[in-house]
């Protein structure tokens, strides 16, 4: 084999790497505009605090409870003292239904993309119990549920990516904290979870939750990232901070939906 052939094969083997690391980026599409997006409903035990937009589809606005909604005169969105952002529902006026349908479809595509990565770097780590771990970038896979009884650290540079494929549920114990180190970015950490997700009282979560089922953020818990659920999301005096906070002119463009569809 010639030296050129060896070099060519070596370069081909680097495909999909970012700064020498495997690229596991998950594309959220229009769903990236939301702090919380759910198909069946979003509830709050007041007062919760959400930085970013929230939306439900195909559910109607009556399935957004505990927020004290005030609908805008355009009837395309609503507001709430608990939400620094806009609130969308499938029964609001055009073009909101199409905007939400696109976001939900993109969230489902992202879930499937995350579930579709192969050749995990870590399989059944800790037999489903993550205790006092520092997690390096890579693909993690479990065929059952995962519990987190103690703090976790995600260590990697700003381009590093993590994907966690969890066939069962995910639960964080009360007071557990996810910590980022080395420049790690919460938008590059994706959890694809096939069953219910529970973030315990006072616990802190970092990353994007791609959840097949119910997500509960218990009293005093917080999440830096996004919650994209294919069923419902329940907040109990919880905090969600999204990396995307629209400027006023972007809000207006999004209301018109021309920018997104």
UniProtKB/Swiss-Prot annotation:
Sorted UniProt keywords: Antifreeze protein, Glycoprotein, Secreted, Signal, Stress response
PTM note: Glycosylated. Glycosylation is not required for the thermal hysteresis (TH) activity. Glycosylation may increase stability and secretion of this protein.
GO CC aspect terms: extracellular region
Signal peptide: 1-20
Practical and industrial applications: Improves cryopreservation of the human red blood cells (RBCs). Almost 90 % hemolysis damage induced to RBCs by freeze thawing with the slow warming at 22 degrees Celsius is dramatically decreased to less than 16 % when 0.4 or 0.8 mg/ml of this protein is used as a cryoprotectant. The post-thaw cell counts of RBCs frozen in the presence of 0.8 mg/ml of this protein and thawed by slow warming at 22 degrees Celsius is almost the same as that of non-frozen intact RBCs, whereas the recovery of RBCs frozen in its absence is less than 30 %.
Oligomeric and partner information: Homodimer. Dimerization is not required for the thermal hysteresis (TH) activity.
Protein name: Ice-binding protein
Organism whose genome encodes this protein: Leucosporidium sp. (strain AY30) (Arctic yeast)
């Amino acid at each position: 084999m010639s030296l050129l052939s060896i070099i060519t094969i070596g370069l081909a083997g680097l495909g999909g790497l970012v700064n020498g690391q495997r690229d596991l980026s998950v594309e959220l599409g229009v769903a990236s505009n939301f702090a919380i997006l759910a198909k069946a409903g979003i509830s709050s035990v007041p007062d919760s605090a959400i930085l970013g937009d929230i939306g439900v589809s195909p559910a109607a606005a009556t399935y957004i409870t505990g927020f004290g909604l005030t609908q805008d005169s355009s009837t395309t969105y609503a507001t709430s003292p608990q939400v620094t952002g806009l609130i969308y529902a499938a029964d609001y006026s055009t073009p909101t239904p199409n905007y939400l349908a696109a976001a939900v479809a993109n969230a489902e595509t992202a879930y499937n993309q995350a579930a579709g990565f192969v050749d995990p770097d870590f399989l059944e780590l800790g037999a489903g119990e993550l205790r006092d771990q520092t997690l390096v970038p890579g693909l993690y896979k479990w065929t059952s549920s995962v519990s987190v009884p103690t703090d976790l650290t995600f260590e990697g540079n700003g381009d590093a990516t993590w994907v966690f494929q969890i066939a069962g549920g995910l639960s964080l114990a009360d007071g557990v904290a996810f910590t980022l180190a080395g420049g790690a970015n919460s938008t590059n950490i994706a959890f694809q979870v096939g069953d219910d997700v529970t973030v315990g009282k006072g616990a802190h979560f970092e990353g994007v939750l791609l959840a097949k089922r119910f997500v509960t953020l218990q009293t005093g818990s917080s999440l830096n990232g996004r919650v994209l659920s294919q069923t419902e999301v329940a907040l109990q005096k919880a905090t969600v901070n999204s990396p995307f906070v629209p400027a006023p002119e972007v809000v207006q463009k999004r209301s018109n939906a021309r920018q997104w569809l």
